[in-house]
Amino acid sequence: MIKVFRTSEMYLIAAEAGAHLGGEKLTQGNKYLNDFCKKRYSGYTEKTYPTASQLISQVLLERKREFIGEGMLWSDLRRTHQGFQRESTFDIDEEYNKINNIMFKYGMNLKYDADDYRFVWPIPKDEIDANPQLKGQQNPGY
């Protein structure tokens, strides 16, 4: 499968890299983020994030907006060692809840700490069976 990289992703990667490298690269990271935002928001006014953590926070926010529904957030949370919590705001019918308890018990309110084992997928059994070097190995928690 070919992974398609959009120009917007490259701008955000460059902005975050500049923040991590610091110094002159922090200035360059701000430029990449401003260039990205100018193309997304009409009337955008350039901003300067003076610290790496501020710039990274803004880049991650833009990544959430830009790549919604594309499966990027999971990787970002893992890469930046962040957990997440999602709480349901749905009004749940108690009778329906009795019928479909699994969904409402396990699917509506979620909390994963940053080091939760579920951030790493299990190694598929077929792969373990096909590769003798993987015999007896599995990612923690599975």
List the model feature ranges, each with a label.
Residues 1-142:
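Acidic/polar-rich alpha-helix caps and helix-coil junctions
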